From Swiss-Prot:
UniProt pathway: Polyol metabolism; glycerol degradation via glycerol kinase pathway; sn-glycerol 3-phosphate from glycerol: step 1/1
One Gene Ontology cellular component annotation held by this UniProt entry: cytosol
Protein's recorded name: Glycerol kinase
Organism: Cereibacter sphaeroides (strain KD131 / KCTC 12085)
Function: Key enzyme in the regulation of glycerol uptake and metabolism. Catalyzes the phosphorylation of glycerol to yield sn-glycerol 3-phosphate.
Any Pfam family hit: FGGY_C
Gene expressing this chain: glpK
Protein residues bound to sn-glycerol 3-phosphate: T11, R80, E81, Y132, D241
Length: 493
């Protein structure tokens, strides 16, 4: 039997997983790497840490799977928007990678918005003018690394998101490529025409010579160096992490939606061939591109999901491990109706208020650890409903009635039941929780001829548990109204 290696390069760690051609998980390896915070609001990674952790985990996963030379394909999924610039000749980065969380270009984004450029940028790229995306990070590097822009114009420097940099390293510098989903997160890519946008590149003074070739999500991206795995292996699938999870959840029909719960939360709604422009400040993006055909999505991001549980553990110290929250929530006094708005780093979609800060409402003398745990978990459900309400308002065709979930917090039965209750719709949790790696393994396997196409893959998607709404509609709406008033109060401060 042939096997597929899925490389999952994330924000805090790199993971590698080996799947067989039936997409059964055979092995996992993971390695964390340091986060670099040069100044408040700045976040960087050393690209050598990204590469070394990927190389180490990839080799370890292959060894643990004991697959005896049957590795047939590689897929790559990655943290999106993070920027790497390196020398074409040597492969050496000219600066640390600037991570998607980095806010150093906030003033530049504000100036561009004040100059009236946001409507054009949003119309072309589907994105908001925000430091989150790659374009202004790349401009910052070209502005602040001596001689960088001139070298880029001479073809000496290359830009890439993390997938592109890893492909360059894996292939020994033979391929400078990316996929459409990663390109769509740079704020330089026209998602309607499927090309790098010359006008936006000109506005930011970014030489187009340094941009990678853009491919489908399932394509030949290059062959690895022979010394890495004993022979050259084709890289056949690439997608940004949230788009890979969308594929792993088999959200292939327009109207299907998934929500991934990690440190934050990312919800994607498949809108098919229709590119929907959001009126609620959601993002319009590419869900996946296969056979030259783009499928679009609306995306909403919540900054704080699983991170609110980390706050209970590391900040308030009312739990020792995340698993304790479910028991506390079950023992809480629901009548207290404590509300936590966890705007620790501002409010994400659909509010986009980076200056807002968190608050607790409804405190009484009897509010204790159990009530805080319950309110923290409930905040994730409320924020998810905010996203879904915005998606329904934006797209007349409407979302289907079921939300597919994955990520660490999806393991909590209590959280998923509350989510179903507060959105008033079923929540489906799959058997395979590693949907991001599964998605990119499927893309690579499909391109290799080992795995089925979308329809058959979707038919094989397996449900572990469905959570049906149990809360009375009047209670649901009263609770959600209270949440809305709390959010408005936070934004008013």
């Amino acid at each position: 039997m042939n096997h597929i290696l899925a490389i999952d390069q994330g924000t805090t760690s790199s993971r590698a997983m080996v799947f067989d051609e039936a997409l059964t998980l055979k092995s996992v390896a993971q390695e964390e790497f340091p986060q670099i915070y040069p100044r408040p609001g700045w976040v960087e990674h050393d690209p050598s840490d990204l590469w070394s952790s990927v190389a180490a985990t990839a080799r370890a996963a292959v060894e643990r799977a004991e697959i005896d030379g049957s590795l047939a394909a590689i897929g790559i999924t990655n943290q999106r928007e993070t920027v790497v610039v390196w020398e074409r000749a040597s492969g050496h980065p000219i600066h640390n990678a600037i991570v998607w969380q980095d806010r150093r270009t906030a003033d530049l984004c504000h100036a561009l918005a004040e100059a009236g450029h946001e409507p054009t940028i949003t119309e072309r790229t589907g994105l908001l003018l925000d430091p989150y995306f790659s374009a202004t990070k790349l401009k910052w590097l070209l502005d602040h690394v001596e001689g960088a822009r001139a070298r880029a114009r001479r073809g000496e420097l290359l830009f890439g998101t993390v997938d592109s940099y890893l492909i360059w390293k894996l292939t020994g510098g033979r391929a400078h490529v990316t996929d459409a989903t990663n390109a769509a997160r740079t704020m330089l890519f026209d998602i309607g025409r499927g090309i790098w946008d010359p006008e936006i590149c000109g506005l930011l003074d970014i030489p187009m010579e340094m941009l990678p070739e853009v491919k489908d999500c399932a394509a030949l991206f290059g062959m690895t160096r022979a010394d890495l795995f004993g022979r050259e292996i084709p890289i056949l699938g690439v997608a940004g992490d949230q788009q890979a999870a969308t594929c792993g959840q088999a959200c292939f029909r327009p109207g299907m939606m998934k929500s991934t719960y990690g440190t934050g939360c990312f919800a994607l709604l498949n809108t098919g061939e229709e590119r929907v422009t959001s009126r609620a400040r959601l993002l319009t993006t590419i869900a996946y591109q296969l056979g030259g055909k783009r499928t679009y999505a609306l995306e909403g991001s919540i900054f704080i999901a699983g991170a609110v549980v980390q706050w209970l553990r590391d900040g308030l110290k009312i739990i020792r491990e995340a698993g304790e929250t479910q028991g506390l929530a079950l023992s809480s006094d629901a009548a207290q109706d404590l509300v936590i708005v966890p705007a620790f780093t501002g409010l994400g979609a659909p509010w986009w208020k980076p200056e807002s800060r968190g608050a607790v409402f409804g405190l009484t003398r009897n509010s204790g650890p159990a009530e805080f745990a319950r309110a923290a978990l409930e905040s994730v459900g409320y924020q998810t409903r905010d996203l879904l309400e915005a998606m329904r308002a934006d797209w007349a065709a409407g979302a289907e009635g079921v939300l597919r979930v994955d990520g660490g917090m999806a393991a909590s039965d209590w959280s998923m039941q509350f989510l179903a209750d507060i959105i008033g719709a079923p929540v489906d949790r799959p058997v395979v929780r590693e949907t991001t790696a599964l998605g990119v393994a499927w893309l690579a396997g499909m391109q290799a001829g080992l795995c089925p196409g979308p329809e058959e893959f979707a038919a094989d998607w397996a449900l572990e548990r469905r959570f049906e709404p149990q809360m009375e509609a009047s209670v649901r709406e009263a609770k959600y109204d209270r949440w809305g008033r709390a959010v408005r109060a936070v934004m008013a401060v």
